[in-house]
Amino acid sequence: MESLLNRLYDALGLDAPEDEPLLIIDDGIQVYFNESDHTLEMCCPFMPLPDDTLTLQHFLRLNYASAVTIGADADNTALVALYRLPQTSTEEEALTGFELFISNVKQLKEHYA
């Protein structure tokens, strides 16, 4: 069975990446992919990690309102948006999930970055 990432690339009309799976979308949105046997994870840094705890708490509260999760990168320097799809997702579900993810990232960048 073909991987969900390859099926997503097919749905987008793109060739599968040969090296690091990364898509650069307009306005500097960089989507990194991490695929396991069970999930396809999409990750996009969208702004520097806030210095004050109130702003950080605001972003963490957004996790209750959306399927897109907000977290920090491994170096604690940037906020990242995360979205996971099960490997059992159809091509249509993967495309819909990707579009939802990109829409959420654009909104986050417009309002906060």
Curated annotation (Swiss-Prot):
Induction context: Transcriptionally regulated by InvF and SicA. Also regulated by SirA.
UniProt-annotated location(s): Cytoplasm
Record has Cytoplasm as a keyword: yes
InterPro entries noted in UniProt: T3SS_chaperone
Pfam family for this entry, one: Chaperone_III
Keyword Cell inner membrane: no
Transmembrane segments: none
Coarse class of the protein's main subcellular location: cytoplasm
A single cellular component GO annotation: cytoplasm
UniProt keyword annotations, A-Z: Chaperone, Cytoplasm, Virulence
Top-rank taxon, per record: Bacteria
Protein's job: Molecular chaperone required for SopB/SigD stabilization and secretion.
Family of the protein in this entry: Belongs to the IpgE/SigE chaperone family.
Oligomer and partners: Homodimer or higher-order oligomers.
Protein name from the UniProt record: Chaperone protein SigE
Lineage: Bacteria, Pseudomonadati, Pseudomonadota, Gammaproteobacteria, Enterobacterales
